[in-house]
């Protein structure tokens, strides 16, 4: 299931009273045609201060690490924790062709971005499925490295030179980024030493810290940040609405079933990173109709255990859910550590790994497309734990280890 990472908490200051919350009613539009043009992602050609340039709005129901509010011609996005322990960052997303607000009061120090953006540099493969789902893959102009990418469409664009690699040596080529002048460079939710110089050079660095969310749906809802930047709010509402509906329907079906005991994870560098009870992994297991001995622990991150401690509590778990790219057979599992054979799930052949789709460079689609599609992950888990609830299920990410 991967190694869950902890989340901290930085609180957002109250935004100016002139802003409308995302759940507020839509303001009357003095110019429907102009507002419609804005909703379709085109620049405003005749600004009217009485027009609401966001007739299609987004609300956040699961994501907690960013907020989104509206004024008539701009949005304010605040990422509460752009990287672990960092202070909140605020972005003013101004509709192209309209005036930016004064950077005073609560907006002092905010980064102003003209939207919809036309060029994006992406630091994480998790962004790729979002822009694909939103139909704006043509706006992707840079990726950190193609090595971990699964998407054949993106790889073809890299091969053709349409998309450039800007950190292929694991360090950001600041001169290349500055020379390209992308509208936005979206981070991977961690700070990099290159971001300071890039900001000083005028590059708009926008944080995407979806991995700090504690629920799978919360992570997926960051598609709405991408939509706010690209002017594809209606599409994001449609896409996420379907994901949310399918997820909750599956969870409701699994809730009625008898819980199955699960062993999540595997050894990594001599430690077993066991997801805590408040983590997104724990939420997925519970929603799939499963349980595990550490489900009652607090915290959204993980705890490190030795294998003996895991055996003591989880030896008899019926299903083992791992995430190891190299495992294809039970023999591969045993070769990793002979002690794995002591688990009941190994003896019965119920060992699964989220490694069905691996890219040419070793990138795992579970970490690329899966972050934005928790409905597909949950579907795999339900079919694994309760196959009677999902006859004929086509697995997206998980596969069973063969004998």
What role is predicted for each listed range?
Residues 2-6, 22-128, 235-263, 389-403:
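Bacterial Sec-exported substrate-binding components of ABC uptake systems
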Residues 5-15:
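Sec-dependent N-terminal signal peptides
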Residues 17-20:
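Bacterial Sec-type N-terminal signal peptides, specifically the leucine/valine-rich hydrophobic h-region
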Residues 75-178, 185-189:
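A short, structured surface patch at a secondary-structure boundary
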Residues 110, 115-119, 130, 162-168, ...:
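Second-shell loop/turn segments in exported
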Residues 118, 123, 127-130, 143-153, ...:
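Extracytoplasmic ligand-binding site segments that recognize negatively charged/polar headgroups
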Residues 213-237, 241, 322-403:
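Structured C-terminal subdomain patch of bacterial secreted/periplasmic proteins
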Residues 252-253, 257-337:
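Flexible, glycine-rich surface segments
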């Amino acid at each position: 299931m991967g190694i869950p990472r902890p989340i901290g908490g930085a609180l957002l200051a109250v935004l100016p009273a002139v802003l409308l919350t995302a759940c507020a009613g839509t303001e009357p539009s003095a110019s429907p045609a102009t507002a419609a043009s804005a909703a379709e992602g085109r620049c405003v050609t005749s600004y009217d201060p009485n027009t609401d340039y966001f007739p299609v709005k987004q609300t956040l129901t699961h994501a907690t690490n960013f907020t989104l509010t509206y004024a008539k011609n701009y949005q304010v996005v605040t990422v509460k924790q752009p990287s672990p322990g960092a202070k909140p960052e605020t972005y003013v997303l101004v509709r192209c062709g309209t005036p930016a607000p004064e950077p005073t009061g609560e907006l002092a120090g905010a980064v102003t971005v003209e939207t919809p953006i036309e060029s994006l540099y992406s630091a994480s493969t998790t962004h790729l499925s979002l822009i694909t789902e939103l139909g704006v893959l043509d706006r992707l102009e840079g990726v950190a490295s193609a090595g971990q990418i699964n998407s054949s469409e993106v790889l073809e664009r890299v091969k053709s030179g349409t998309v450039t690699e800007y950190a292929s040596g694991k360090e950001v080529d600041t001169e290349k980024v500055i020379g390209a002048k992308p509208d936005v460079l979206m981070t991977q939710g961690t700070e990099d030493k290159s971001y300071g110089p890039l900001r000083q050079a005028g590059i708009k660095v926008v944080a995407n810290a979806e991995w700090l969310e504690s629920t799978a749906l919360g992570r997926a809802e960051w598609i709405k940040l991408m939509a706010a930047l690209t002017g594809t709010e209606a599409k994001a509402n449609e896409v996420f609405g379907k994901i949310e509906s399918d997820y909750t329907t599956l969870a409701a079906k699994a809730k009625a079933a008898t819980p199955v005991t699960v062993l999540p994870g595997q050894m990594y560098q001599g430690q077993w990173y066991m997801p805590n009870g408040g983590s997104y992994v724990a939420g997925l297991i519970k929603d799939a109709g499963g349980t595990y001995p550490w489900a009652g622990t607090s915290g959204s991150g993980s705890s490190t255990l030795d294998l003996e401690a895991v055996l003591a509590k989880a030896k008899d778990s019926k299903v083992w859910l791992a995430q190891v790219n190299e495992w294809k057979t039970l023999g591969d599992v045993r070769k990793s550590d002979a002690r794995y054979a002591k688990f009941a799930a190994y003896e019965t052949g119920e060992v699964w790994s989220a490694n069905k789709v691996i890219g040419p460079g070793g990138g795992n689609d579970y970490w690329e497309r899966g972050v934005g599609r928790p409905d597909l992950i949950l579907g795999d888990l339900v079919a694994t734990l309760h196959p009677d609830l999902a006859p004929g299920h086509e697995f997206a990410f998980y596969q069973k280890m063969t004998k």
